[in-house]
Amino acid sequence: MSLQHFIQNALSNWMRQEGPESDIVLSSRIRLARNLDKVRFPTLFSNEEASAIIALFEEQFTGYEVPGIGKFELVKMDQVQPLEKRVLVEKHLISPHLTEASFGACLLSENEEVSIMLNEEDHIRIQCLFPGFQLSEALKAANQVDDWIEDRIDYAFSEQRGYLTSCPTNVGTGLRASVMMHLPALVLTRQINRIIPAINQLGLVVRGIYGEGSEALGNIFQISNQITLGKSEHDIVEDLNSVVAQLIEQERSARKALYQTSQIELEDRVYRSYGVLSNCRMIESKETARCLSDVRLGIDLGIIKGLSSNILNELMILTQPGFLQQYSGGALRPNERDIRRAALIRERLKLENNGNRQEDETI
């Protein structure tokens, strides 16, 4: 299995499979920050120390199997082309920060549910990404990988403070739990404007699809914990679970109310967006995200039938600049990307329609 597997096999498990509450919760992610004992943190370490960490993981962990998760392959950032790095970021397998690290690397599981980033902000960042609302399952997998690593190396740990990290906000459990949610009805009814401040008051953060500093394109929001010290991993996840469950209920209520009070307007919006995606010859990323959000809402409400509900997950990633350029075989100017994006969307919708036609003929 090579890096090309991750680039060309475009659909990760969280995009391809449906999990619990997947009409609203697109994915659940757990990230654990860890550092090696008696080794300077990445903000201060030398090139030799950084290289030694990669060598250690190459020797101790590459090719070895974690029960239920599989084997890992090491990808060194200095051996990856800029375009390939961008694709890995767009698939949420690595962070933008890692792409800039001179001695960065990543261990990737074959099914792409688990990635272990090396020499990012911390020596080790374990990430587990699951489809739908599965925070507890993702935490279980992350802890399994964490134990597997800790059996072979010693972590920087304080009895008083917990796991020691480069950034003080990660000290303690080192845990970041997050979910990606599609909340179009709360946006359309403007309820989101009062909900976000209320969530922030609970010690949670609301961001866009690519985390800190990113925009909530396509009405997709990432909600995560902010506090890692003074709470157990279980409590952090349960607190987030509770808020997400309430958001799911509020979004479903808003969808029902929209459909009951503004059915024609909603159907018009959905079908207009579907028409744009089906027929456009050029389309920018923001318009793509808006139209995909409308179509996914239409699928979930039963307005549009015969389309996969995963189409939002897939095309939100596949129409990003890195994937588009990979799809076309080289660098593209912005207007060329808009043309390629439109072609890819039309092709994907055509595949869906052809699949439905073949099923009808079989019946």
From Swiss-Prot:
Pfam families: ATP-gua_Ptrans. InterPro entries: Arg_Kinase, ATP-guanido_PTrfase, ATP-guanido_PTrfase_AS, ATP-guanido_PTrfase_cat, Gln_synth/guanido_kin_cat_dom. Transmembrane segments: none annotated. One of its GO terms (cellular component) is extracellular space. Keywords: Allosteric enzyme, ATP-binding, Kinase, Nucleotide-binding, Transferase. One of its GO terms (molecular function) is protein kinase activity. Belongs to the ATP:guanido phosphotransferase family. This is Protein-arginine kinase.
